[in-house]
């Protein structure tokens, strides 16, 4: 068997006037993430990890932030399209592990919804998807609440 590990990362600034969407879950908060699409930092990191594991580049190569057709795009749609492309290339996903770093809001109440969305979009049992919520211990721009970061690792299997 051919195993491939991918690592993904994304960060977006928090700004007023936008919804906060993480892992496909809309989270009540006074600010949301700034971006060309819905700026779902977690799904962008996972998408990058999947493309990376398949040696197919990154999210920007497939869904450019300069392309008007992706303006306001639902990142769940992009994740499903990413999965379709790597599946067509002969890969399946073994598991996903991820972390979201946010000083606020508290993400723990939303983790199971995020896991369920990711599992559904990737055709995986929820037991193969993990999402962890972390803070930056009030250090740096994340600790000051200026943005939210996500990191993801994915294991692909070449069929």
Swiss-Prot record:
Sites annotated Transition state stabilizer: 36, 135
Pathway annotation: Isoprenoid biosynthesis; isopentenyl diphosphate biosynthesis via DXP pathway; isopentenyl diphosphate from 1-deoxy-D-xylulose 5-phosphate: step 4/6
CDD domains: MECDP_synthase
EC numbers: 4.6.1.12
Top-level taxon: Bacteria
Record-listed a divalent metal cation binding positions: 10, 12, 44
SUPFAM superfamilies the UniProt entry points to: IpsF-like
Sequence positions that bind 4-CDP-2-C-methyl-D-erythritol 2-phosphate: 10-12, 36-37, 58-60, 63-67, 144
Cofactor binding, note field: Binds 1 divalent metal cation per subunit.
Cofactors required: a divalent metal cation
Alphabetical GO biological process terms: isopentenyl diphosphate biosynthetic process, methylerythritol 4-phosphate pathway; terpenoid biosynthetic process
GO MF terms held by the record: 2-C-methyl-D-erythritol 2,4-cyclodiphosphate synthase activity; metal ion binding
Keyword tags: Isoprene biosynthesis, Lyase, Metal-binding
A Pfam family reported for this protein in Swiss-Prot or TrEMBL: YgbB
Membership in a protein family: Belongs to the IspF family.
Subunit structure: Homotrimer.
Function: Involved in the biosynthesis of isopentenyl diphosphate (IPP) and dimethylallyl diphosphate (DMAPP), two major building blocks of isoprenoid compounds. Catalyzes the conversion of 4-diphosphocytidyl-2-C-methyl-D-erythritol 2-phosphate (CDP-ME2P) to 2-C-methyl-D-erythritol 2,4-cyclodiphosphate (ME-CPP) with a corresponding release of cytidine 5-monophosphate (CMP).
NCBIfam families for the chain: ispF (TIGR00151)
Protein name: 2-C-methyl-D-erythritol 2,4-cyclodiphosphate synthase
Gene for this chain: ispF
């Amino acid at each position: 068997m051919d195993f491939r590990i991918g690592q993904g990362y994304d960060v977006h600034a928090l700004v007023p006037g936008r919804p906060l969407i993480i892992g496909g879950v809309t989270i009540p908060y006074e600010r949301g993430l700034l971006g060309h699409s819905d700026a779902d930092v977690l799904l962008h990191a996972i998408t990058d990890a999947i493309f990376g594991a398949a040696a197919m580049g990154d999210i920007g190569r497939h869904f450019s932030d300069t392309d008007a057709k992706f303006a306001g795009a639902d990142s769940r749609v992009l994740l499903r399209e990413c999965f379709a492309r790597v599946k067509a290339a002969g890969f399946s996903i073994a598991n996903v592990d991820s972390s979201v770093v946010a000083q606020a809001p508290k993400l723990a109440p939303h983790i199971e919804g995020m896991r369920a969305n990711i599992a559904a979009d990737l055709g995986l049992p929820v037991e193969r998807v993990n999402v962890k919520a972390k803070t930056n211990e009030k250090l740096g721009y994340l600790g000051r609440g200026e943005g939210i970061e996500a990191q993801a690792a994915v294991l692909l299997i070449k069929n």
